[in-house]
């Protein structure tokens, strides 16, 4: 698998992967992503700012992740929208993406990686914990159906 920066013309591929993962989450009863116009605009802006990465196998986009600086702490990178197209899940790709994010953090002089998971998505929380992230508890400012758990990993 190769991880590379997304280019503007790949926006539809990013949205497609996220939509398919969103459908999968909804089937599990997890309401988290919705592919709204706001998502379209946010992702388009993140691509322009070089924060969106594609996971590619044999020139086919099979996943995406957004890794960008935290607005409140420039020494922190935030991982979001980690999505792997369902047929490619459970193949050990997500830990590779987390390792990539950690390497990127080191290159950028960041000392913390952080992200959130929906409170109901136990498997993603477990994946983060298995890869050295520490559960920081829930965020209370979100509506009940969007309560999420914060995770952090110190970069050394």
Positions of the model-derived regions?
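Acetyl-CoA-dependent GNAT
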Residues: 8-11, 16-87, 98-100, 104, ...
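Residues forming the Rossmann-fold NAD(P)(H) cofactor-binding site
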Residues: 95
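Conserved catalytic-core motifs of GNAT/GCN5-like acyltransferases
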Residues: 116-118, 125, 129-149
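Active-site acidic-Proline motif in GNAT/NAT acetyltransferases
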Residues: 85-87, 91, 120
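Short glycine-rich hinge loops at helix-strand junctions in the catalytic core
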Residues: 92, 109, 132
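Short, surface-exposed alpha-helical segments at coil->helix boundaries
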Residues: 40, 122-125
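Conserved GNAT acetyl-CoA-binding A-motif
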Residues: 98, 105-117
């Amino acid at each position: 698998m190769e991880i590379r920066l997304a280019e503007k013309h790949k926006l539809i591929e990013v949205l497609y992967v996220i939509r398919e993962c969103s459908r999968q989450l909804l089937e599990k009863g997890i309401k988290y992503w919705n592919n709204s116009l706001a998502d379209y605009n946010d992702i388009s802006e993140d691509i322009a700012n070089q924060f969106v990465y594609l996971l590619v196998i044999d020139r086919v986009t099979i996943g995406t992740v957004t890794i960008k600086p935290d607005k409140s702490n420039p020494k922190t990178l935030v991982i979001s929208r980690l999505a792997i197209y369902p047929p490619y899940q459970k193949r050990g790709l997500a830990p590779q993406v987390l390792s990539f994010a950690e390497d990127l953090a080191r290159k950028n002089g960041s000392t913390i990686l952080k992200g959130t998971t929906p409170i109901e998505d136990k498997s993603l929380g477990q994946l983060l914990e298995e890869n050295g992230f520490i559960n920081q508890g829930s965020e209370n400012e979100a509506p009940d159906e969007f309560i999420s758990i914060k995770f952090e990993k110190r970069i050394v």
